[in-house]
Amino acid sequence: MSGKNDFYSTLGLTPIINAVGNQTIYGGSTPSGDVKAAMEAAEDNYIVMEELFQKTGEYIAKLLGAESGYVTSGAAAAITLSVAGCMAGTDPEKIATLPRTDGMKNEILLQKPQRYTYDRCFELSGAKLVEVGSSDHCSKEELEAAINDNTVAIAYYVQPDNWESKAVSIEDALEIAHNNNIPLIAAAASQIYPIDYMLENAQRADLVCFGAKYFGAPHSSGIVVGKKEYVDKVKAQSFIAYQLEGRNAMGRSMKLDRQEVIGAVVALEQWVKMNHEDRFSVNIRKQESISDQINNIPGVSSEVTETPTFNKYALKVNIDPNVMSAKQLADELANGNPRIMVAPPADPNAHVKSDITAAGHGIETGNNFLLINTSEVSESQVSQISNRIKEILSK
C-alpha cells in the first residue's frame, strides 16, 4: 500500500474511492492544494484564538456580503450555537445554564413540511422544536399564529425552490419573524451554488448556517453569517468563550484547530472567486471517461445528467434489471477491491437511497440505476471505477 495510506493499513483499514461526494460518513471533503498549504502555514505559528476568530469572521462576512461571520465546527455546530445565542444572548448566567433553559424563551418554530434529518440540531442546546402546519403544507397565518411568549426564533430549512406552495417562503417567514421581534435561523448547509444564490442566502436571514466541507474546507468546519447583533451572541457560546469572562459556554465541545479556521476561510474565498464552469468541466470529463468504458457492457447504458446539487452533474448508470439490480451493483462496488462507494447508505447495511435526492445520487423508485459523483474522485481513480464495474457485470 502507498506511503500515505500506511497507517490505514496498520489499523487494518481499507481506504475507499468516494464516488458519492461530500458525505460525512466517508470523510467529508478534499481540500485543494492552496487550502492545505494555508493550513500547514497556520500550524507553524500559534495565535490568540479570539483575535483569529474576530478577523476571520470579518473576512468571511466581507466575502459573503453579510454584517458579521464566525467559523464553527460544522453546520450542525453553527445551528446549535445559533439557537444557544438566541436563548442566552451574552448573559453569563444564562450561558452557563444551557442546555437547561429555565427562565428563558426556548421554543423554535419549524414548518412541518421542512422537517429534515438534521433538524435535531435546533434542539441540542436545550431548545424545544415546535412543528407548525401539516406535513404537506404550512400557511403564513399558521406560522404567525404559532408565535407565543416562549418563541425565541423561527428555523428555516433553505431549499432552491423556496418550498413553492408547500411552506411559507423565506422572505415571508423573515417578515413574520421581524414583525414579532424574533430572529430567523436559516439552515443552508449545502446551498452554495450558484454563487449569487449563496450570497442571497447569506445576506437575508438573521443567522445563516453553512457546512464548509461542501466548498472544499476541512471536513469538521462550517460558518455562520448574519446580523452582527446575533453573530455576537453566537460567539458568546463558543469554545473559546468558555474561558472568557467566566461564561462556561456549552460550545466548549465544539472545538476547532487554528489550521481548520484558516482552511475554512481560504476555501470559502476560493469558492466564491473560482470559475465554476471549469470545475464542472473537470467532473464531466471524469464522468465521460467512465461512461465510455462501460457503455459497451451488455445491459448497461450511461450518461452525464444534471442533478439539483452544487456539483450539478453526475454519471447516471442504467442497468438492465435482468442483468443485475442497481443495489446489488452498489453493494458489490462497496465491498470489493478497491472499495468504491457510489451512494450514501439509507441505513448501515444499504449503499443506495430510494430516490434521486438533493445529495444527487441513489436509485430511482421503479427504475434501476445509480449515480456516480466524481467531485471527490481523483484522476487515477477514474479507471478503477470503470474497470471494477466491468469486472462485476462481466461475471
What are these regions (language model features)?
Residues 3-30, 57-71, 76-271, 295, ...:
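Conserved PLP-enzyme active-site core in the AAT-like
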Residues 7, 295, 299-385:
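Conserved C-terminal alpha-helix-loop-beta "cap" of PLP-dependent enzymes
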Residues 17-55:
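A glycine-/small-polar-enriched, mobile loop at the entrance of the PLP active site in fold-type I
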Residues 40, 269, 386-394:
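A short, amphipathic alpha-helical segment
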Residues 46, 161-163, 378-379:
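Short strand->helix junction
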Residues 239-243, 334-341, 390-395:
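A common structural junction motif
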Residues 256-257, 283-295, 318:
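Gly/Ser/Thr/Ala-enriched C-terminal appendages of enzymes
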Residues 268-290:
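Structural signature of PLP-dependent enzymes
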